[in-house]
């Protein structure tokens, strides 16, 4: 599969490809990571890559309606155990704040089989509709 084929599918379509064995979760993740690495220098969207943890998860047994589908999580109230959690705040970033546990939303995403491979930029505490 290449990225042009990947982008033709929504999340359920990608999950169906994984379930049928046409593509693996690891292959989808590799495509998603490659695309983010290509566009992120221009967008500054990905601020906390979690590629290694995502590769481990994608290589395991995944279940749920979105099993094997790569996803990015906003760095805003979606805590992931052991990952930076700054909510766009420079003070929290300088202090090196890390989440102690997964939020309920992250637990549900993971139970649905999603493979979170990074955290994305956010305006400070979500107060604006744009990031700088």
Where is each model-derived feature located?
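Short glycine/serine-rich loop/turn segments
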Residues: 67-132
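Long amphipathic alpha-helix in the N-terminal Rossmann-like dinucleotide-binding domain
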Residues: 52-59, 110-114
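An N-terminal boundary/leader segment
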Residues: 1-48
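Glycine-rich loop at the start of a catalytic domain that most often binds anionic cofactors/ligands
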Residues: 58-62, 78
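Short glycine-/small-residue-rich flexible loop motifs, especially phosphate/cofactor-binding loops
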Residues: 15, 61, 106-107
């Amino acid at each position: 599969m290449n990225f042009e084929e990947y982008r033709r599918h929504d999340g359920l379509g990608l999950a169906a490809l994984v379930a049928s064995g046409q593509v693996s979760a690891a292959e989808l993740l590799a495509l998603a990571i490659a695309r983010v690495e290509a566009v992120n220098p221009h967008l500054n969207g990905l601020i906390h890559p979690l590629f290694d943890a995502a590769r481990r998860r994608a290589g395991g047994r995944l279940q749920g309606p979105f099993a094997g589908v790569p996803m990015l999580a906003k760095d805003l109230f979606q805590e992931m155990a052991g990952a930076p959690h700054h909510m766009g705040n420079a003070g929290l970033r300088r202090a090196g704040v890390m989440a102690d546990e997964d939020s309920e939303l992250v637990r549900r995403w993971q139970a649905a089989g999603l493979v979170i491979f990074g955290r994305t930029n956010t305006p400070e505490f979500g107060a604006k509709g744009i990031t700088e």
